[in-house]
Each structure stands twice: as C-alpha cells, then as structure tokens.
UniProtKB/Swiss-Prot annotation:
The chain crosses the membrane at residues 13-33, 50-70, 89-109, 175-195, 205-225, 236-256. This is Phosphatidylglycerol--prolipoprotein diacylglyceryl transferase. InterPro entries: Lgt (IPR001640). It is an enzyme of class 2 (transferase). One of its GO terms (cellular component) is plasma membrane.
Length: 278
C-alpha cells in the first residue's frame, strides 16, 4: 500500500524552498506574541513592550536553540561548519531557545525597568502554546518520533489516518512523540491560563515557574521515548537531565519565594496599579 507522505516543503518562492517547519514555527511565535501583548495590556504594560522585546528575544532564542543543538551534535558539523547556519531543515533545540530568550529577557527588562517576573508570567502560557504548535513542524520534517511500533497500536490511539501514515519512517511505524508533547503542552497552556486568572492563588513569578514545572515534567518522560535525542555523555539524554534539574529547581524556588511575606499575588488590577504608579 502506498502511503501519502507529507512533503516537508510547503512551496517554492523564486526557486527557494519554503519549509512547513519554518511556517509552523513562525506561526506559533506570532500567536505567542499576540497573546502576550494582550496580557501585557491587562497587567498595565504596553503592547510595544512585548513587540520591542521580540527584537531582542527572537534572535537570541534562535541563536540559543541552534547553538544548543550544534553543541551536542558537533560531529555532524565539524567537517562542514557552514552547515551550522542552515536551519530550514530543523536542528533547533527548545531548551537552547529558552536559555537564549531568557537571557535576552533579563537584560531587556532591566533596561526597561520592568519586573522580570511579571514579564515571564505574561509570556509563559503563550510560550508553551507556541511549543505545542511548533511540534507539528517536527511532524512535517519527519523527526522527533519515538520507538518502533505497529500500525495497529497507532490505530488504537484513534489517530487520524494522515498522522498514522506519516509515522511510517523508512518502512517502520514509530510512536508520535511529537504529538504526545504537543498535547501535553496544550494542556499546560489551559492549566496555566486558568490558574493565572484565579485571584489570590499564584504569586508573582509562579505562572512562569508553573510552566517550568509542567513542561519539564512531561518532557522528561517523552524525551525517554525519542529516537533522536541529544546526548551529553554515555547514555545520558541532555533534555532529560536538564528537565530533571529544572523541575527540582522550580519547585525549590517556589517554596523559598513563598516564605517572603511581601511577595505579591499575580492579580491583574493590583499589578496594574503597581506598575503604572512606579
């Protein structure tokens, strides 16, 4: 039976291939920026604060994501380092993007005299939703898949036929780990938004820390299924190690910060008053 494999190239512009991976990633980023800008206005910041940050944050995130990937796949680039600059076929690591974007955000908020924790809280739900969307770029690139399985297993998950067909990689069916993470991230987005709206529940900074806890917990287990993991040394998967560290660190930070009686709740009206009068 011939399977209808998706084409990773969406179209060609003046002979230059434009990949679905890039289109999906950009779409996720655009949605994240729009959602973050709306939340920024609700807590007393300006839309331009979000848009201006993207001038810093997006390049930093892309560079961080690429350097992170290349650092652990150096053997693929050592003989032809010019390939480091070619990202249309993938090769971006989410954790590297978070590190690069996080550093840019720290310096940006300091430069603008904006609370770093507030900005992180604004962005966190949008970021995890963008990650959920971005995983479909992996699907279009036929990457980020799991161990070998059977078509019957995939059918038992009640997946659409186009997903099942495209989990056939080189004649072998694989588990759709991209989909597992995408669904996990969508659930995380819903949880974070609901908790963020709940008055007097989350303290400032805890939306972001909740994102770290949720994402790293799911990523730890999903990463264990992936066939294309980056390895630090021996059989230690980089993303699993980093997920474990971030999960524990985020919980510890929440506990320590909760001991501060002056720590404010993430409350839009109070936060708006505080920001606009400072």
């Amino acid at each position: 039976m011939m399977l209808a494999q998706v084409n990773s190239i969406a179209f060609r512009l003046f002979g230059i291939p434009v990949y679905w991976y890039a289109i999906i990633i950009v779409s996720g980023i655009a949605l994240a920026v729009w959602l973050s800008s709306r939340e920024a206005v609700r807590v007393g910041l300006k839309e331009d604060d979000v848009f201006d940050f993207m001038l810093w944050g997006l390049p930093a995130a892309i560079v961080g994501a690429r350097l992170y990937y290349v650092a652990f796949q150096w053997q693929d680039y050592v003989d032809n380092p010019i390939e480091i600059f070619f990202t249309r076929n993938g090769g971006l690591a989410i954790y590297g993007g978070l590190i690069g974007g996080g550093l840019a955000l720290f310096f940006f908020t300091r430069h603008r005299f904006i609370s770093t924790w507030t900005f992180l809280d604004i962005a966190a739900p949008s970021v995890i939703l963008a990650q959920a969307i971005g995983r479909w770029g992996n699907f279009m690139n036929h990457e980020a898949y799991g161990p070998a399985t059977t078509r019957q297993f995939l059918e038992n998950l009640h997946l659409p036929t186009f997903i099942i067909d495209n989990m056939n990689i080189n004649g072998t069916y694989h588990q759709p780990t991209f989909l597992y993470e995408s669904v996990w991230n969508v659930l995380g987005f819903i949880v974070l938004v609901l908790l963020r709206k709940k008055p007097h529940f989350l303290k400032e900074g805890e939306v972001f820390l909740g994102y770290i806890i949720w994402y790293s917990f799911g990523r730890f287990f999903i990463e264990g299924l992936r066939m294309d993991s980056l390895y630090a040394f021996s059989n230690i998967r980089v993303s699993q190690l980093l997920s474990l560290v971030m999960f524990v660190a985020a919980i510890v930070i929440v506990i320590v910060r909760r001991r501060n009686p002056n720590l404010k709740f993430y409350n839009r009206e109070k936060q708006k008053k505080k920001i606009t009068t400072s």
